[in-house]
Amino acid sequence: MRQALPLVTRQGDRIAIVSGLRTPFARQATAFHGIPAVDLGKMVVGELLARSEIPADAIEQLVFGQVVQMPEAPNIAREIVLGTGMNVHTDAYSVSRACATSFQAVANVAESLMAGTIRAGIAGGADSSSVLPIGVSKALARVLVDVNKARTTRQRLTLFSRLRLRDLLPVPPAVAEYSTGLRMGDTAEQMAKTYGITREQQDALAHRSHQRAAQAWAEGKLAEEVMTTYVPPYKNPFAEDNNIRGTSTLADYAKLRPAFDRKHGSVTAANSTPLTDGAAAVILMTESRAKELGLHPLGYLRSYAFTAIDVWQDMLLGPAWSTPLALERAGLTMADLTLFDMHEAFAAQTLANLQLLGSERFAREVLGRAQATGEVDDAKFNVLGGSIAYGHPFAATGARMITQTLHELRRRGGGFGLVTACAAGGLGAAMVLEAK
């Protein structure tokens, strides 16, 4: 593995993250039912700019992501620029890296800052599981294309007569990997069995996540980084995540049946992330530009790493691969971290990654490293809960984690934090953050 250069501009400026914000996260078909991702993105970027009081023309680039894309708005980033009153000349493009999408957006803006092409930009992501591109069957799609080219009514009727009743049924978005046909939950089940992770361990982690997230809200720790939203019919504000089960008990988790391997499985709806709607964004600048504008950064981006592994086995081990690389590039070890935040796609996936981060054998035989990355101290791990509790609007999760970790680092007097996530396609992402 090749060691990267420090994340600084040509002038030696660090990459500052000056602010971050997100919408509350809502379970599918609840508070944001009928609100498309592009509107959620406009909400959060508009409010982020208003709160920051940064001159509108100071933002030179917006990189935004959306995993479940809508055909009518394929470039969500540009639609956000045009829909929030930003300067129409602002460069804007969209990215997608599955569950690590806003990690990618942040990396892209950081690269523009390091290249010197911009001095300030916004990165983020939004997704809606309530507004989905419902498709049609391949047979109907082909006929519709041919009908559009038909010249006579008779030709059109002949084409339609080829269809069977089942060809007319709507086709929901695929939930399986395109290359393998496996669902993420299938891989989570495989990892639970491979690494000996029990149902009780998974339920305990999920319960911990909900308890810590509920406590974070109760103590007011999230109020500054979560906006209040108003959606049609504008009768009631929506200000807090609605997936968190603050009063649940471990016995409640034990009642649920396995969701993927019905007979022998351990992965349930309760120890997995739910389908969620939401958006999140961060403002990045060069350190000198932040000083010019009189801004006090939340913190700095010290390093990042993206990795890719095979999709047939252990597809969700991205954090175990990307974490050591990000630490190496930051010049740090696991012991140097104040906080370690991992995306909880599934409790099984999270526990498997934690196990392998501390495994000498995995480090030597799989990663080709001399020693294990290191055990993750429970006192530093997902201290405010994780995605199982908050929910997971695919493209927004990374920006949530970055903002949340920087705020918590500042509350603790500063230090280093690492945020990491697995993603579909065997991808992994990790970023090292620094705050004072």
UniProtKB/Swiss-Prot annotation:
Pathway info: Lipid metabolism; fatty acid beta-oxidation
Substrates-to-products reaction catalysed: an acyl-CoA + acetyl-CoA = a 3-oxoacyl-CoA + CoA
Active site per the UniProt annotation: 99, 392, 422
Keywords: Acyltransferase, Cytoplasm, Fatty acid metabolism, Lipid degradation, Lipid metabolism, Transferase
Gene3D superfamilies: 3.40.47.10
Keyword Cytoplasm: yes
S-S bridge residues: none
InterPro entries, per database record: Ac-CoA_C-AcTrfase_FadI, Thiolase, Thiolase-like, Thiolase_acyl_enz_int_AS, Thiolase_AS, Thiolase_C, Thiolase_CS, Thiolase_N
An example Gene Ontology CC term for this record: cytosol
Pfam families the record matches: Thiolase_C (PF02803), Thiolase_N (PF00108)
Annotated EC: 2.3.1.16
Family the entry assigns: Belongs to the thiolase-like superfamily. Thiolase family.
NCBIfam families, per database record: AcCoA-C-Actrans, FadI, PRK08963.1
Self-association and partners: Heterotetramer of two alpha chains (FadJ) and two beta chains (FadI).
Functional summary from the UniProt entry: Catalyzes the final step of fatty acid oxidation in which acetyl-CoA is released and the CoA ester of a fatty acid two carbons shorter is formed.
Protein name: 3-ketoacyl-CoA thiolase
